[in-house]
Amino acid sequence: MELYFYQDCEYCQAVFETIKKLKISDEFTFKDIRVNPDYAEELINLTENETVPCLVNEKGSMKEANDIRKYLVSHFD
């Protein structure tokens, strides 16, 4: 799975807290769109905007932090 984010985003931090709590960071490729402009371009190509956090897996993309957190808990807890 890929997680598009940037460090100063409070919603991204909430997702990171869930990932840390579930001890599943090895399941992700983390893509900071402010550190690497190529990641921002990828995100725009995938979703037509730069809204983060954005979780991408084989089924598609998910953007709302609460939805991402619920998904992670339901699949990894």
Regions found by a protein language model. Name each.
Residues 57-77:
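Non-catalytic, surface beta->alpha helical segment in thiol-disulfide oxidoreductase systems
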Residues 15, 40, 65-66:
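Short glycine-/acidic-enriched loop or helix-start segments at secondary-structure transitions
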Residues 22, 46-47, 75:
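Residues at alpha-helix termini
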Residues 46-56, 65-66:
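Structural micro-motif
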Residues 1-27:
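Local sequence-structure signature of Cys/Sec-based thiol-disulfide redox active-site neighborhoods
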Residues 10-11, 38, 63:
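Short alpha-helical
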Residues 32-49:
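Thioredoxin-like thiol-disulfide oxidoreductase module
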Residues 28-32, 61:
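Conserved beta-strand scaffold positions in the cores of enzyme catalytic domains, especially
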